[in-house]
């Protein structure tokens, strides 16, 4: 009798994806972040579901319902802070996952890569709408500022913003629809993740060398299942240290003040994981230009397969490209820092220089260095 694992219509899909999957023998810990993102998504959906059981999406009661969750619901504080800090862990894993893809040339699987970029957009949209739900000061003003950016779109801008708001300002209708979208999007993300994996399993995983690994494959289980479990334990450890020791470390104290349309906080800023994009947005004095730069700062990831000029896939054997990659990482850290600073000298000019450098490295410097490295191969 054949093993049910290999014959059952449903179980065999799981088998081909997680058990008998041939995987390269040399993939490093940088390949753990895919599974960690899956765990983050599961944690977020589960904690979010339990929060939704007690949350009310009404401007009058939203803030107090979150307070009620933290004070009166059994372990409500734990669920709430796991959800809030789970989002931070999600983005840490996302950035590392994307960085791994850039460093090792994984973007040459362009269907997998492009679905990944769409996933990044979807997760960012979900996180933004989730931040609005507690209806604190930063929730309200963050929603006002970011949705207002759409008014920069010529001709239809103002109408579009009022349509999204469901009125003439961010109000009850906005909060209700943001809750609805925040609830549904993670399930759309889950479906996209399955498509992401489907395309990945068409080609198999990349590996640190960037070379074809067909001649040296090992089964996913037990080798990478145990490796993933170690990664998951470390992720949960870091998350729980954050949740139990300093749950508000990454939050904004302004969000503990109920939303008040009549008083603007001195510094409106998003959560830390959007600060790099926010800095790029602010570095351009023109509204439409800023919005375009904001969108392009993420959309530019889709250009990497086209901009790949090197004869080698991975950066493992390309020291000049490696150096430029780490300068890009440092530039993103700089942008993140600038995004959280007030709009004044010297932060404005630092932000503008960092924004120019960001686009220059990706569009000009990395491809040019790749071509130079191709020449070096002939020496």
From Swiss-Prot:
Transmembrane segment boundaries: 33-53, 77-98, 113-133, 178-198, 226-246, 288-308, 320-340, 347-367
Bilayer topology: Multi-pass membrane protein
Chain positions recorded as heme b b562 binding sites: 83, 182
Keyword Transport: yes
Listed cofactors: heme b
Cofactor notes: Binds 2 heme b groups non-covalently.
Any Gene Ontology biological process: mitochondrial electron transport, ubiquinol to cytochrome c
Compartment(s) where it occurs, according to its Swiss-Prot or TrEMBL record: Mitochondrion inner membrane
Further remark: Heme 1 (or BL or b562) is low-potential and absorbs at about 562 nm, and heme 2 (or BH or b566) is high-potential and absorbs at about 566 nm.
Record function comment: Component of the ubiquinol-cytochrome c reductase complex (complex III or cytochrome b-c1 complex) that is part of the mitochondrial respiratory chain. The b-c1 complex mediates electron transfer from ubiquinol to cytochrome c. Contributes to the generation of a proton gradient across the mitochondrial membrane that is then used for ATP synthesis.
Protein name (Swiss-Prot/TrEMBL): Cytochrome b
Species in which this protein is naturally found: Neotamias panamintinus (Panamint chipmunk)
Lineage, broadest ranks: Eukaryota, Metazoa, Chordata, Craniata, Vertebrata
């Amino acid at each position: 009798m054949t093993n049910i694992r290999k014959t059952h219509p449903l179980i065999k899909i799981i088998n081909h994806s997680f058990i008998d999957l041939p995987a390269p023998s040399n993939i490093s810990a940088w390949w753990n972040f895919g599974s960690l993102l899956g765990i983050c998504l599961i944690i977020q959906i589960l904690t979010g579901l339990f929060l939704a059981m007690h949350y009310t999406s009404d401007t009058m009661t939203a803030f107090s319902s979150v307070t009620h969750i933290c004070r009166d619901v059994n372990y409500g504080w734990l669920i709430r802070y796991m959800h809030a800090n789970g989002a931070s862990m999600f983005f840490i894993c996302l950035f590392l996952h994307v960085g791994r893809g850039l460093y090792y040339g994984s973007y040459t699987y362009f269907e997998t890569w492009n679905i990944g970029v769409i996933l990044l957009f979807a997760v960012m949209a979900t996180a933004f709408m989730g931040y609005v739900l507690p209806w604190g000061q930063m929730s309200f003003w963050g929603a006002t500022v970011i949705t207002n950016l759409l008014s920069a779109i010529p001709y239809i801008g103002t109408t579009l913003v009022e349509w999204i708001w469901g009125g003439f300002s961010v109000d009850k209708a906005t909060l209700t629809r943001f809750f609805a979208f925040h609830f549904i999007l993670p399930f759309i993300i889950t479906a996209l993740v399955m498509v992401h994996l489907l395309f990945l399993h068409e080609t198999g995983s990349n590996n640190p060398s960037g070379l074809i690994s067909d001649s040296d494959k090992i089964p996913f289980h037990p080798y990478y299942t145990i490796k993933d479990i170690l990664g998951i334990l470390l992720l949960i450890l870091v998350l729980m240290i954050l949740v139990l020791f300093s749950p508000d470390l990454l939050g904004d104290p302004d969000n503990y003040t109920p939303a008040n349309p009549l008083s603007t906080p001195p510094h409106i800023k998003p959560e830390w994981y959007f600060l790099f994009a926010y800095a790029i947005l602010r570095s351009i004095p023109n509204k439409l230009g800023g919005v375009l730069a904001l969108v392009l700062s993420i959309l530019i990831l889709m250009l990497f397969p086209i901009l790949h000029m090197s004869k080698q896939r991975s950066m493992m054997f390309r020291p000049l490209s490696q150096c430029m990659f780490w300068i890009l990482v440092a530039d993103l850290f700089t942008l993140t820092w600038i995004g959280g600073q007030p709009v004044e000298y010297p932060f404005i000019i630092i932000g503008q220089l960092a924004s120019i450098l960001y686009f220059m490295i990706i569009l000009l410097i990395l491809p040019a260095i790749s071509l130079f490295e191709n020449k070096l191969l002939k020496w």
